[in-house]
């Protein structure tokens, strides 16, 4: 492989890992984009499905919808998605 090709491959992989890390370490915006338009103001629109997710605050949320509802209430990036499953 030519040095230029190897360099481009290395840069591409670095960008991929950085973007994955950015979503897992913080920003709920991309993670919650599907829920922004569906959440009702009364907060009762989340299903009771048990598929836990862990927030960067160390709390386990019942599902993505419950996490996103809390994240949008707090806004300003104070709560991020850490990983699927219990904390």
UniProtKB/Swiss-Prot annotation:
One of its GO terms (molecular function) is serine-type endopeptidase inhibitor activity. Expressed in epydiymis, in the caput. Residues 1-22 form the signal peptide. Its main location: secreted. GO terms for biological process: negative regulation of proteolysis. Disulfide bonds join 32-68, 46-65, 54-87. Keywords: Disulfide bond, Protease inhibitor, Secreted, Serine protease inhibitor, Signal. Residues 26-87 form the Kazal-like domain. Inhibits trypsin. It comes from the Eukaryota. This is Serine protease inhibitor Kazal-type 12. It comes from Mus musculus (Mouse). The record marks 48-49 as: Reactive bond. One of its GO terms (cellular component) is extracellular region.
